[in-house]
Amino acid sequence: GVACLCDADGPSVSGNTLSGILWLAGCPSGWHNCKAHGPTIGWCCKK
């Protein structure tokens, strides 16, 4: 997957660690959708 910004990482993509992974077919086991707003499918962060 491609790294993505989790809500817990900070407000912007630049200067923050991207701890999420963008999955096209939902989140793998042990992960959850990390975006509390907007489209959440595929934006996965570790629980």
Curated annotation (Swiss-Prot):
Coiled coil: none annotated. InterPro entries: Anenome_toxin, Myo_ane_neurotoxin_sf. GO terms for molecular function: sodium channel regulator activity; toxin activity. GO terms for cellular component: extracellular region; nematocyst. The keyword 4Fe-4S does not apply. It is found in: Secreted; Nematocyst. Its main location: secreted. Disulfide bonds join C4-C44, C6-C34, C27-C45. Keywords: Cardiotoxin, Disulfide bond, Ion channel impairing toxin, Nematocyst, Neurotoxin, Secreted, Toxin, Voltage-gated sodium channel impairing toxin. Pfam families: Toxin_4. One of its GO terms (biological process) is regulation of signal transduction. Belongs to the sea anemone sodium channel inhibitory toxin family. Type I subfamily. Binds specifically to voltage-gated sodium channels (Nav), thereby delaying their inactivation. This toxin is active on a variety of voltage-gated sodium channels (Nav1.1/SCN1A, Nav1.2/SCN2A, Nav1.3/SCN3A, Nav1.4/SCN4A, Nav1.5/SCN5A and Nav1.6/SCN8A). This is Delta-actitoxin-Axm1e. It comes from Anthopleura xanthogrammica.
